[in-house]
Amino acid sequence: MVREGMYEVYMPLIAEGEITNLIVKSEKGTLGRKIFADLSSIARGKLGNLIGKITEIKDDKVIAEPLGITLYASYIQRFVRRGTTKIDDSFVCESADKRKLRVKPVMITRKIVKRSVHSALVRETRDFLEKSFAEAKMNDIFLETLHGEMQRKLSKKLKRVYPLSFCEIRELLVEK
């Protein structure tokens, strides 16, 4: 039986320490509940939310598993300037542990680009992310995305097509 009160929420697969606090009234109403944690304490600066689902409560700790990462629109908007092209995409990939993930990458070019360059960037992004996700487990994908490793690899790959000023994964969500 869980007593009512304030609990620390942990996501052991993503972060070392607590990610947020949660008021718990009953165990029944808490398990399976979605939580939103600000990424400013985990990642590099104020940039988005980490979405999780509570899976268990033990020893005055609430344990959650990751469901998604979303960036704030204002974070992305800071990099968009006149004379640049913003490229968005959305597709579903499968991880090595057969979990379906919806990926929404966003890229901002240094200058305005033609449709052929736009298409080439989207195609290269899809190919790279589908291949990378197929080789890694879901938790590793979340960790790499959270720490910016996946974005660095993607940006390096896309530099061969066209120079980018910004390359991020805007949303990474677990599909049902």
Question: What is each model feature region?
Answer:
Residues 1-113:
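Hydrophobic-cavity lipid-handling domains and compact docking modules
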Residues 79, 83, 144-145, 175:
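Surface-exposed loop/turn and secondary-structure junction residues enriched for glycine/proline
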Residues 94-141:
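Short acidic, glycine/tyrosine-flanked loop/strand segments centered on an H-E-D-like triad
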Residues 129-132, 150, 158:
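A generic hydrophobic-segment detector
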Residues 136-153:
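Acidic, low-complexity glycine/serine/threonine-rich segments
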Residues 153-176:
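Extended, low-charge, aliphatic-rich alpha-helical segments
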